[in-house]
Every structure is written in C-alpha cells, then in structure tokens.
C-alpha cells in the first residue's frame, strides 16, 4: 500500500512527531507544502499543529489527497488529549475545516506538543497575549482545562512531547498496511 506522512508544523513539535513516526513505520514524511506529491497514495497520514483552532496546512493539503485514500489525521497541540472536553473541542474545529466525507473516513488521533513563547512570531505572541488577557480573570469554576493550562503555561517554555503516545498510531498504521479494517 503506497503511503505517505504529510505534516504541517510551525515551531517543530509536529515535525518531530512526523519524523519519529517515519522512523517507526518506514513511511516517508513530507511538509504539507509538498502535498501535491501524494497522488497515487492509498494511505495518507496527516499531522498538523493546532493554532488558533485550526490545523496547520490541513486545508491546503486536503485538496491533494486522493478521495479513495485511507486517512489518518493527527493533531498536535497544548490541549491535553486525555481530557474529553479538549478532544470534543478539537474535533468540532476539525469538522469545520474538512469536507464531511474526509472527516468521516479519517481515523483521528491527538498528541500533545509544546510551546516556547520566545520562539513565537510577533503575530502568535500577540494572539496569545490577547487570548491570555481575555481569560485570565475568568472565575476558576468557569474555566475549561484548556484555558487553565494556557494560563499556567503563559510566557513559559513547556514541552509535553512524548514519543510513547505514537504507539497506538503505529499499531493502527501497521494494521491498515496488513489489510486490517476499522
């Protein structure tokens, strides 16, 4: 089964996961900017960093994915995927970004990334400051886990990257490559 890993990364954690996944599966990784190269692939694995509710490069890359290809979609962000409310919010956002048929056929996984405020672009620093200022005085009982985490990590360097979280994804890929169904 012809397969490819496509990733959209702004600050490096998504690229790290894509390269590690490549090592574990022997599937070539490419940036979403090269997405035109996916033609003929039967399995497309997309990893995208979460930024302001969107998945980096997904809209661009989806245009090139073969309609009949199997799709694994992996988001990478600060939100803890162990929190069901975070997952619900991420998936709600994904639904808005993807055609319905692509969303329905995608196997979706979520990984934690990291953030280093010193590395952020001016635009992203400004967005984070505005977001922080808009939520910092919210009563604790009204805060989501995602909001609490953002406030706790604001202006710091945090890294939640964990290679072990790739294990279920590798298992799913190997199952698909051996002809296994959902």
Residue ranges and their predicted role:
Residues 1-68, 171-182:
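N-terminal beta1-alpha1-beta2 submodule of the flavodoxin-like/Rossmannoid cofactor-binding fold
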Residues 53-182:
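FMN-binding flavodoxin-like domain, especially the glycine-rich phosphate-binding loop
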């Amino acid at each position: 089964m012809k397969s490819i890993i496509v990733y959209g990364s702004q600050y490096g954690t998504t690229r790290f996961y894509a390269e590690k996944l490549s090592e574990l599966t022997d599937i070539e990784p490419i940036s979403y900017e090269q997405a035109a190269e996916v033609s003929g692939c039967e399995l497309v694995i997309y990893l995208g960093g979460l930024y302001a509710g969107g998945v980096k490069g997904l809209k661009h890359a989806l245009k090139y994915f073969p309609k009949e290809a199997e799709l694994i979609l992996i988001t990478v962000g600060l939100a803890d995927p162990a929190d069901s409310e975070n997952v619900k919010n991420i998936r709600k956002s994904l639904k808005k970004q993807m055609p319905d048929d692509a969303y329905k056929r995608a196997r979706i996984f979520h990984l934690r990334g990291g953030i280093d405020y010193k590395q952020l672009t001016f635009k992203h620093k400004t967005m984070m400051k505005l977001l922080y200022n808009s939520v910092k005085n919210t009563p604790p009982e009204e805060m989501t886990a995602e909001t609490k985490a953002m406030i706790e990590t604001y202006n710091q360097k945090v890294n939640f990257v964990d290679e072990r979280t790739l294990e279920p994804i590798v298992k799913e890929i190997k199952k698909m490559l051996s002809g296994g169904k959902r």
